[in-house]
Amino acid sequence: MLAQQFPEGIRMSIFAHKLVGGNGGADLQGINILNHYIGMREIRAQDFPEMKFIPFALGLFFLLGLRTAVFARVHQLVDLLVLFIYFGLFSLVAFYYRMYTFGHQLSPEAAFKVPPFTPPVFGHQHIANFDVYSYPGLGTYLLSAYALVLGVLLVIEARRKAPAAVPVNRVAAA
């Protein structure tokens, strides 16, 4: 987040297993103080129960990927890719919903009134006098690469296992 009173910006990183405030954690505390003034509830790791199971889910996807690589079955690749896409979509929707509830459940007794808003999941948004930026980190790119590799492997395996086309000889009728 950037604002005139914070020229260096205030940073918060959300990982699969933890929240980290920039500046040694002080930025998360600063964000929570600012949130208090607009009536938004505090951002705490305890409020994100998915942080407890996402690391295990990612480990499971890694193990399933290894199993699929060893046995190289097309149906296993399809199953793994579909499951991984569902997991990714569910995670994005859950994160968007979490951002929506944080920005729309504002206390009416707040010191500063701002209209309800949804912090950006990706991209930029101007909220009050802040420019809020939200961009994926390395983990998102690695997970996207994992899905891309699964998709490429699926295409390769499907082509390899497809029966060869038999040429048809046409005989002209006499």
What is each stretch, according to the model?
Residues M1-E8, L83, F87-L89, A94, ...:
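Alpha-helical transmembrane segments of secretory-pathway, organelle, and plasma-membrane proteins
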Residues M1-P49, Y96-S134:
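Long, glycine/tryptophan/cysteine-rich extracytoplasmic
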Residues F48, V74-L81, F130-T140:
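Membrane-water interface of alpha-helical transmembrane segments
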Residues P49-T68, Y141-G151:
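Hydrophobic alpha-helical transmembrane segments
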Residues M51-F62, L77, R160-A174:
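Extended alpha-helical regions
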Residues G65-S91, V166-P167:
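Interfacial segments of alpha-helical transmembrane regions
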Residues L66-V70, V93-Y100, V152-A162:
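Structural signature of transmembrane alpha-helix termini at the membrane-water interface
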Residues H104-A174:
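Terminal transmembrane helical module of multi-pass membrane proteins
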